[in-house]
C-alpha cells in the first residue's frame, strides 16, 4: 500500500471539496437547503462550511443561496495555464493575431462545456473584445459546436464537420466567433476561435479569416501529432 493510500483523510477538507463539487453548469446556484441535503449534513454544518468557503472567495452568497466565487476562476485559470496544449498553441495564436488583427481564443472541453484556457488579444483595434480565461462557454457557441460536432458526434452538425469551421453571433449581441478544431493524435483536444464584432467576423467559411484560422488550427494539430484518415491508412 502506498504512503498516499495510508494517509488519513482530513474530513473537513474532503467535505469542503464535496461542497464545491455540487455546483455545475446546469446548477450554478444552490440554496442552503440543497447544499445541506446533498452534503448529508445538518443545516448548521453546511452553513459553517459555506461561510468558510465564502470568506476564502471560493463561494459567493446570493439572495437565494450560493454560487462559486471569484477565487475559483483564478485557481482554474492557473491550472489550465499548465496544460500542454496551452503552451504549444501560444506561438501559433500569436502569429494568427498578427495576421488577422482579431482576438484569438483557445478552449478545451471540461466534460460539460468548453472552457477558455488562453486568450491572445488584438490590441490594435479601437474596440477590444475581452474574453476571460477560465470562462465556460455555452454549448451553442462556435466553440461549443466544434466539440458537439467532433467530440460528441451530434447530428445536425454535418456542415461543421465538412468545413471544419463553426460560426455563432447570437451569444453576445454584436459579437461573433468563428471556431476550428484542434486535434492531438486522432482526438479533438481544443477549439481555436476568432472573436470580434459581427462586422469584422463574417459567417463565411471561404473568407480570408476562415482560411487563416483553419490553416493555423491544422498546423497546430500536425505539431500535436494529428494524422488525417488517409495518412493513417498509409502509416
Regions found by a protein language model. Give the residues of each.
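Amphipathic alpha-helical effector-binding/dimerization core
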Residues: 65-154
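Amphipathic alpha-helical regulatory segments at dimerization interfaces
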Residues: 22, 38, 87-99, 103-105, ...
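A short, aliphatic-rich beta-strand micro-motif
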Residues: 176-182
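Short, structured helix-loop boundary elements
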Residues: 9-13, 69, 82, 86, ...
Amino acid at each position: 500500500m502506498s504512503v498516499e493510500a495510508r494517509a488519513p483523510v482530513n474530513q473537513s477538507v474532503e467535505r469542503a471539496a464535496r461542497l464545491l463539487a455540487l455546483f455545475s453548469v446546469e446548477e450554478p446556484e444552490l440554496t442552503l437547503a440543497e447544499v445541506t441535503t446533498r452534503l448529508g449534513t445538518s443545516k448548521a454544518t453546511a452553513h459553517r462550511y459555506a461561510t468558510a468557503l465564502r470568506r476564502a472567495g471560493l463561494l459567493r452568497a446570493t439572495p437565494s443561496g450560493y454560487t462559486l466565487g471569484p477565487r475559483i476562476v483564478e485557481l482554474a485559470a492557473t491550472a489550465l495555464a499548465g496544460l500542454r496544449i496551452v503552451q504549444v498553441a501560444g506561438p501559433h495564436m500569436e502569429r494568427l493575431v498578427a495576421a488577422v488583427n482579431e482576438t484569438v481564443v483557445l478552449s478545451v472541453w471540461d466534460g460539460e462545456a468548453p472552457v477558455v484556457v488562453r486568450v491572445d488579444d488584438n490590441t490594435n483595434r479601437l474596440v477590444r473584445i475581452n474574453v476571460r480565461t477560465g470562462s465556460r462557454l455555452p454549448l451553442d457557441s462556435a466553440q461549443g459546436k466544434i466539440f458537439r460536432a467532433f467530440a460528441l458526434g451530434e447530428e445536425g452538425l454535418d456542415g461543421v464537420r465538412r468545413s471544419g469551421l463553426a460560426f455563432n453571433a447570437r451569444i453576445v449581441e454584436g459579437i461573433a466567433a468563428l471556431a476550428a478544431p484542434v486535434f492531438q493524435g486522432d482526438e479533438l483536444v481544443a477549439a481555436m476561435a476568432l472573436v470580434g464584432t459581427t462586422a469584422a467576423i463574417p459567417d463565411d467559411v471561404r473568407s480570408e479569416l476562415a482560411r487563416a484560422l483553419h490553416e493555423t488550427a491544422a498546423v497546430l494539430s500536425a505539431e500535436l501529432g494529428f494524422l488525417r484518415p488517409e495518412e493513417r491508412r498509409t502509416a
